[in-house]
């Protein structure tokens, strides 16, 4: 672009001129000020003929008029071709003389356009001959205030400043506020001159003010509307002008604005998508609302059309925004104007306009929809997103303004807003939420608006209008408060009910609605800036809690979701309670009881209100918080009216806050203006304790705990998760007695998912230490998931605790899992033990102190686990020998690490034993540790790899020769025995001394020590290659024994109880068991040529086992004979031995039978152990599949005694089974233990044993029932068909066993059928089979009852036991129950007829005695009561017994309802019947019973 002076040394722009010269050189000061501030531009004057007629034939192109660059077209217009007269610069001549260069050609350097214009209009005149004509056109985006106004130029001033001060104008003339006001009024009149004071006076030909549309309608131009907008605004800011403005002017303007909007809308609908038309309509809307804001109360100004037209236009524009495809940048001015128009609407509403219900409804409909609209997707354009957020903000403000201004419409507004809740965002994306406060909290617009509305329900305005604090006014205030509270309560209840009802109707689709609402409330509950949250949330929580009341019937899905919501709310409440400062958790009752807490409570309220005031929080929120304070005071006043001291404090507080209102405030300023929100939040938490929400914590907790006992698994799992949320905040919650007891119960729950959730719960913050025993009740659970979880928890507990008792307990449970049906669990358990016992030691080999510490800890744990019980001892041996010391299970490097660490541990172990023995202490713990260490050392010595060295043996030898009488000597003997079996090349002197010591101490040893010492003596003699001394000792023993043998042969009764004889029997048997297995070369007294020692001792023992030998000696002899046979199994082939054993089992000598069983047990165990050692790892469960395949290819090593063990088990099985069912439980355990071993090793056909195992289910001993359950469970996995075929015999045996073990309360043994059902009667496959067998058993018993002669006491007792057990079974199918009930019902009717036939109509005519009738009557009553009991238990009606066969078969797929939990046991009814029988009133009771039924 060219300009005058281009390419010359003259500044072309002001900024360039300022570099060298002051600004005033180019532009006068006053002119510059006007230039900078004036929101106008000067256009070229038009000839008056332009305005003469609107019908001059010109077609106005609105698109051309809307553009800025229209210069060329204006020049070419004929109406503008009249010569333009240009003003000559007034100082041209003088300035020409003062410069060096004066251009001779003024056209030089001008653009072609400028030159063409000047050439057309030639000639210059002096300025005095030129009349100034200018026209002001306001820019649409004017942002500056006009400070200069000249009256002769007709300029308009738009100064916003309303202060009464002088304003400097560009003319240098000062103007007062009154002058400005007058100027504003003149501006309005000037505009009205052209717009017209009525329709006829409008200068529609003025194209600067009027724009003709294609439909021949006229609308005001954007320039005119901008001027008008600024003028109205200036007038609005000057209230003194209100009376000077005539209503007719405003009505005219309103009419024009409405027409502008109408005509623009109609043109847009015709297809003219012109942004200028929308802009005109928006500006008209702004002007219209600004007119409303003038404060004129004339009803004519508030016609429905005036408000509805702009509102409808805005509504249409909103709809078009939803489908807008144009870029935001091209519509920025329109969007800004639209936003400005909307912002005026809430101001208008708050001014108290004359709005009828139709208008209000329209506004509510439009802006509720706009607020909740999510059709417009989130855009990447930040400006557009900001615009849309502002629109929603204003929409919310409009709705809140309507709610606050129109009390009668509040319900409708809330209802309309609730109708849009389905439009809430399905995902909580930040762009779809609104940020509130400075805490980076985002909530939905719905919640924000709803809460902003409800905050307006308070008594602040009422209090503000009170003239004084008189008693009568206080009473009025109380009534007003109750009224407001009631309204708030009802509306909150309605909101929550509506949201929940929508959710209940379609929980899957509308879950996001309730989730969003609750999430918003939880985010705001801790802030004093949102006090109404407490009211909404407490109401919602109560409503959610009521879902679980008996009167509510909802789906399981709804229950689960509601529980999740309750859990989130409860967790937040618990968080608040935990965060509250000490001694500030005071509810109203507590504050009444402790009035000293009141001042601090009121102070907390003051702080929160002052904080809200300081941060400029919403006035409605602060007022609602103040209202809460007022309500609390009124409630306290009601509660404390009888306490003088307290009532004074409360009354003073009430007067104080009311006086503050009269003084124009809500309370004193914040003492510490820099107070942190975290401090204020704690004050607010203290306040919350006085309200309902936090007091709902206890009902919430009780609900959670009660739901843990529900049958619905998902509900229980969710309840546990709720509890977990609390525990994650503070694990102290788990120490709550109520919670603790519930966890204990639920850890025994049958549901795997619930157990898993409980285990997660108790794992929070290592809380499992309080429940470790209950946790490990599930270490052998049916669920793999639960077993793994328990294993992981045990691992953590072992690592985290320093308590040796806990360590031993949990590591023992880990050890038990090296036997499991799941390979992964076996692997886990093995690795845990390997890491803790081996690799952890290996890691610190280069740190002596650490090594000693860790080794000591490992050894202490190992030693205690190894002796914990028989099972742990066996598993420890298995783990040591068949995993750790199994080369096939490890790489060479890993195996070397293991053996190296075990060698080191052995060193420390021997050292520890030596240290403990050297201490002269009698402390119990020290003695126990020493015994445990020796036992562990014995296990190390007995392992497949030798870790003990000669040095170790040498170090332990002094304890061998000591005279100390304790168990230590036994373990030392065991260690030496095992070591000598592996080591060789001992010094002869050491061997000789050791042999001397052993032989000399032999007579003083007890039975256990003899069993260890004899093999050691023989081993030492073998190492010495000299058995002469042993032979001599044996001869000595026999020489003392034979006199007794001779006496027994001659006179059996002459043998009496003799301690010496008993010892000789044990010693001689010991020599025979472990020494001289073959005929000896050394001379042994009394042995014949070729006779072995064990054969000779066998003969001696058979002599001492004769019938007339005293019982004690016979028992010792039989015991030792059986042991001897165990070491030399060929002896069991002796007919003399077998005859003796058979005879003993047929006798009544229980103790001898048990002795034989114990010996057989030792034999079987020893032989199986040998087998395991020979076969190796395949005797344990291996998780290594490659190893399994390898081992399966290896045939099991046969051993000589295999057939003997099986033959013995088979021969004596019946005797063993009989002894299992002894009434004396302690003695029966011996037989049960042997039976378990026989079944485990597979020595006999299990079908013979299964009925007895089933019978043991009826034992009164929980331990025996547990053992029986484990046995049958194992059998069921292997031989399912055998178990089912044995059920009938097993149940019959169980019934007899129940009667046999408890003659008085036999019928209370009511658990064996339910245990059987749990094991083999569940599932689609086994359930029907089990119930079929059960029905057959019942039928067989009932069929045997035909008449009086078939009903003896045994039959009656059997029926009783069967009935009580059936009552505890859990029937699943209706068919199973109904078919059984029909069988029972038919029998009861049949028996009733038999009885009635016998007794006749009167008692005196009895054909038989009542005693003979008692059995059949008891059976009939028990069966009838059982049928009634089962019907009631499952909630069935009597008519199910009338179903025919077809109808009955249809019940197979119908499940029964759950059992009623509050029904007493059936055995109590049988006890009642038996009492009538014992009192001789049975017949009378039967008659009454028959009559009643």
UniProtKB/Swiss-Prot annotation:
Signal peptide: none annotated. The modification Phosphoserine is found at residues 43, 74, 127, 157, 162-163, 305, 320, 753, 1179, 1182-1183, 1185. Phosphorylated at alternative sites Ser-43, Ser-74, Ser-162, Thr-360, Ser-1179 and Ser-1183 when the principal phosphorylation sites Thr-67, Ser-127, Ser-157, Ser-163, Thr-231, Thr-236, Ser-305 and Ser-320 are mutated to alanines. InterPro entries: ARM-type_fold (IPR016024), Cohesin_HEAT (IPR026003), Nipped-B_C (IPR024986), Scc2/Nipped-B (IPR033031). Changing residue 305 to E: In scc2-8E; mimics constitutive phosphorylation, retains normal SCC2-SCC4 interactions and chromatin association, but exhibits decreased viability, sensitivity to genotoxic agents methyl methanesulfonate (MMS) and hydroxyurea (HU), and decreased stability of the MCD1 cohesin subunit in mitotic cells. Changing residue 67 to E: In scc2-8E; mimics constitutive phosphorylation, retains normal SCC2-SCC4 interactions and chromatin association, but exhibits decreased viability, sensitivity to genotoxic agents methyl methanesulfonate (MMS) and hydroxyurea (HU), and decreased stability of the MCD1 cohesin subunit in mitotic cells. The modification Phosphothreonine is found at residues 67, 231, 236, 360. Keywords: Cell cycle, Centromere, Chromosome, Nucleus, Phosphoprotein, Repeat, Transcription, Transcription regulation. The N-terminus (residues 1-181) is sufficient for the interaction with SCC4. PANTHER family: NIPPED-B-LIKE PROTEIN, NIPPED-B-LIKE PROTEIN DELANGIN SCC2-RELATED. Belongs to the SCC2/Nipped-B family. Plays a structural role in chromatin and is involved in sister chromatid cohesion. Forms a complex with SCC4 required for the stable association of the cohesin complex with chromatin, which may act by hydrolyzing ATP from SMC1 and SMC3 heads. Binds to the nucleosome-free promoter regions of ribosomal protein genes and tRNA genes. Involved in transcriptional regulation by cooperating with the RSC complex to maintain nucleosome exhaustion at its binding sites. Present with 3310 molecules/cell in log phase SD medium. This is Sister chromatid cohesion protein 2. It comes from Saccharomyces cerevisiae (strain ATCC 204508 / S288c).
């Amino acid at each position: 672009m060219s300009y005058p002076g281009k390419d010359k040394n003259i500044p072309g722009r002001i900024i360039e001129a300022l570099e060298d010269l002051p600004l005033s050189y180019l532009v006068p000061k006053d002119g510059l000020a006007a230039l900078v501030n004036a929101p106008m531009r000067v256009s070229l004057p038009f000839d008056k003929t332009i305005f003469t007629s609107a019908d001059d034939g010109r077609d106005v192109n609105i698109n051309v008029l809307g553009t800025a660059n229209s210069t060329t077209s204006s020049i070419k217009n004929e109406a503008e071709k009249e010569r333009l007269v240009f003003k000559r610069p007034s100082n041209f001549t003088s300035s020409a003389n003062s410069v060096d260069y004066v251009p001779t050609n003024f056209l030089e350097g001008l653009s072609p356009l400028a030159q063409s214009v000047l050439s057309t209009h030639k000639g210059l005149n002096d300025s005095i001959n030129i009349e100034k004509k200018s026209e002001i056109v306001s820019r649409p985006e004017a942002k500056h205030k006009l400070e200069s106004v000249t009256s002769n130029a007709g300029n308009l001033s738009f100064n916003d400043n309303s202060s009464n001060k002088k304003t400097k104008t560009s003319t240098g003339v000062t103007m007062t506020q009154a002058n400005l006001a007058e100027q504003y009024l003149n501006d309005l009149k000037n505009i009205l001159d052209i717009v017209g004071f009525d329709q006829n006076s409008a200068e529609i030909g003025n194209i600067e003010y009027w724009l003709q549309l294609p439909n021949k309608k006229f609308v005001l131009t954007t320039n005119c509307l901008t001027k008008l907008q600024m003028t109205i605004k200036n007038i609005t800011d000057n209230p003194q002008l209100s009376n000077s403005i005539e209503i007719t002017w405003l009505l005219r303007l309103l009419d024009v604005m409405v027409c502008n909007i109408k005509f623009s809308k109609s043109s847009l609908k015709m297809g003219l998508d012109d942004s200028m038309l929308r802009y005109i309509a928006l500006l008209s809307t702004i002007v219209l609302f600004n007119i409303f804001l003038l404060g004129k109360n004339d009803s004519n100004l508030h016609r429905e059309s005036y408000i509805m037209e702009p509102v409808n236009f805005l509504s249409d524009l909103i709809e078009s925004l939803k489908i807008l495809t144009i870029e935001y940048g091209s519509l920025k001015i329109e969007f800004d104007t639209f936003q400005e128009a909307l912002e005026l609407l809430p101001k208008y509403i708050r001014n108290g306009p004359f709005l009828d219900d139709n208008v209000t409804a329209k506004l509510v409909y439009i802006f509720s929809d706009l607020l909740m609209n999510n059709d417009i997707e989130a855009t990447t354009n930040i400006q557009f997103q900001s615009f849309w957020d502002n629109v929603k903000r204003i929409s919310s403000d409009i709705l809140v303004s309507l709610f606050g201004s129109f009390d009668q419409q509040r319900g409708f507004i809330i209802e309309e807003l609730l109708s849009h809740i389905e439009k809430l965002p399905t995902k909580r994306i930040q762009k779809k939420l609104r940020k509130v406060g400075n805490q980076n909290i985002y909530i939905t617009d719905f919640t924000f608006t709803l809460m902003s509305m409800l905050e307006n329900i308070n008594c602040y305005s009422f209090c503000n209008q009170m003239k004084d604090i008189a008693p009568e006014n206080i009473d009025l205030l109380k009534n007003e408060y109750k009224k407001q509270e009631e309204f708030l309560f009802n509306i909150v209840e309605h909101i929550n009910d509506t949201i929940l009802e929508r959710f209940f109707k379609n929980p899957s689709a509308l879950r996001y609605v309730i989730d969003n609402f609750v999430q918003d409330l939880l985010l705001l509950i801790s802030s004093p800036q949102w006090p109404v949250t407490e009211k909404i949330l407490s109401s919602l929580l109560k409503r959610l809690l009521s879902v679980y009341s008996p009167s509510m019937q909802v789906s399981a899905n709804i229950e689960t979701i509601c529980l999740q919501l309750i859990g989130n709310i409860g967790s937040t409440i618990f968080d608040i309670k935990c965060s509250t400062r000490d001694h500030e958790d005071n509810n109203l009752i507590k504050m009444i009881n402790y009035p000293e807490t009141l001042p601090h409570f009121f102070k907390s309220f003051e702080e929160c209100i002052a904080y809200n005031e300081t941060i400029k929080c919403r006035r409605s929120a602060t007022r609602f918080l103040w209202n809460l304070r007022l309500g609390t005071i009124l409630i306290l006043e009601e509660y404390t009216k009888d306490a003088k001291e307290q009532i004074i404090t409360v009354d003073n507080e009430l007067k104080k806050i009311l006086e503050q209102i009269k003084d124009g405030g809500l309370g004193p300023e914040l003492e510490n203006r820099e107070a942190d929100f975290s401090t204020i939040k704690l004050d607010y938490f203290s306040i919350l304790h006085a309200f309902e929400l936090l007091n709902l914590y206890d009902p919430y907790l009780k609900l959670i705990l009660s739901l843990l006992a529900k049958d619905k698994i998902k509900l229980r799992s969710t309840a546990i998760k709720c509890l977990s949320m609390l525990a994650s905040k503070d694990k102290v919650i788990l120490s709550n007695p109520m919670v603790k007891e519930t966890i204990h119960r639920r850890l025994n729950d049958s549901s795997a998912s619930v157990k898993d959730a409980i285990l997660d719960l108790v794992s929070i913050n290592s809380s499992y230490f309080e429940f470790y025993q209950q946790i490990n009740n599930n270490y052998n659970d049916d669920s793999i998931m639960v077993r793994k979880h328990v294993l992981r928890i045990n691992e953590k507990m072992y690592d985290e605790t320093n308590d040796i008792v806990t360590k031993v307990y949990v590591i023992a449970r880990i050890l038990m899992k090296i036997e499991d049906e799941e390979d992964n669990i076996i692997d886990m358990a093995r690795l845990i033990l390997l890491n803790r016992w081996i690799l952890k030691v290996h890691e610190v080999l280069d740190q002596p102190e650490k090594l000693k510490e860790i080794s000591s800890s490992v050894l202490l744990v190992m030693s205690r686990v190894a002796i914990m019980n028989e099972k742990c001892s066996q598993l420890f041996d298995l783990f040591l020998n068949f995993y750790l010391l199994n080369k096939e299970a490890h790489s060479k490097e890993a195996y070397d690490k293991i053996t190296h660490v075990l060698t080191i541990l052995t060193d420390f172990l021997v050292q520890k034993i030596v240290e403990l023995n050297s201490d002269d202490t009698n402390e119990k713990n020290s003695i126990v540790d020493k015994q445990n260490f020796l036992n562990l050392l014995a296990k190390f010595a007995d392992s497949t790899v030798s870790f003990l060295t000669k040095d170790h043996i040498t170090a332990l030898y002094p304890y061998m020769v000591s005279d100390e009488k304790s168990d230590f000597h036994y373990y030392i003997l065991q260690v030496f025995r095992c070591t000598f079996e592996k080591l060789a090349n001992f010094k002869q002197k050491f061997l000789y001394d050791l042999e001397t010591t052993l032989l000399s101490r032999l007579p003083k040893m007890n039975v256990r020590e003899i069993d260890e010492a004899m093999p050691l003596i023989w081993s030492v003699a073998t190492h010495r290659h000299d058995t002469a001394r042993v032979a001599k000792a044996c001869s000595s023993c026999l020489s003392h024994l034979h006199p007794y043998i001779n006496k027994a042969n001659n006179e059996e009764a002459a043998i009496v109880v003799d301690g010496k004889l008993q010892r000789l029997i044990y010693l001689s048997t010991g020599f025979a068991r472990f020494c001289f297995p073959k005929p000896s070369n050394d001379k042994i007294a009394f042995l014949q040529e070729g006779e072995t020692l064990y054969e000779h001792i066998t003969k001696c023992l058979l002599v001492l086992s004769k019938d007339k030998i005293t019982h004690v000696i016979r028992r010792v002899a039989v015991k030792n004979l059986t042991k001897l046979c165990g070491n030399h199994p060929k002896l069991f082939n002796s007919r003399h031995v077998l005859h003796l054993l058979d005879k003993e089992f047929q006798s009544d000598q229980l103790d001898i039978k048990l002795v034989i069983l114990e010996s057989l047990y030792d034999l079987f165990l020893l032989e199986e152990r040998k087998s395991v050692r020979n076969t190796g790892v395949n005797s344990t469960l291996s998780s290594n599949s490659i190893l399994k395949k390898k081992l399966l290819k290896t045939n099991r090593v046969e051993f000589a005694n295999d057939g003997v063990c099986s033959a013995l088990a088979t021969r004596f099985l019946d005797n063993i089974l009989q002894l299992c069912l002894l009434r004396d439980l302690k003695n029966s355990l011996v037989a049960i233990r042997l039976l378990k071993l026989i079944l485990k090793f597979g020595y006999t056909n299990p079908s013979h044993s299964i009925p007895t195992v089933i019978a043991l289910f009826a034992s009164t001993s929980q331990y025996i029932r547990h053992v029986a359950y484990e046995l049958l469970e194992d059998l069921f996995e292997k031989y399912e068909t055998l178990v089912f075929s044995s059920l009938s015999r097993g149940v019959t045996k169980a019934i007899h066993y129940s009667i046999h073990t408890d003659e008085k309360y036999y019928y209370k043994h009511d658990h064996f059928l339910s245990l059987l059902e749990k094991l083999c009667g569940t599932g689609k496959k086994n359930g029907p089979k089990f119930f079929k067998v059960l029905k057959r058993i019942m039928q067989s018993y009932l069929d045997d009852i035909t008449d009086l002669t078939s009903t003896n006491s045994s039959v009656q007792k059997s029926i009783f036991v069967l009935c009580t057990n059936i009552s505890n079974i859990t029937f699943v199918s209706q068919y199973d129950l109904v078919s059984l009930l029909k069988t029972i019902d038919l029998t009861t009717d049949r028996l009733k007829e038999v009885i009635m036939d016998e007794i006749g109509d009167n008692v005196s005519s009895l054909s038989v005695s009542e005693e003979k009738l008692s059995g059949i009557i008891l059976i009939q009553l028990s069966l009838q009561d059982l049928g009634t009991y089962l019907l009631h238990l499952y909630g069935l009606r009597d008519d199910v017994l009338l179903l025919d066969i077809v109808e009955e078969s249809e019940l197979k797929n119908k499940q029964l309802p759950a059992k009623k939990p509050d029904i007493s046991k059936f055995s109590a009814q049988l006890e009642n019947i038996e009492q009538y029988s014992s009192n001789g009133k049975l017949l009378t009771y039967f008659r009454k019973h028959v009559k009643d039924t």
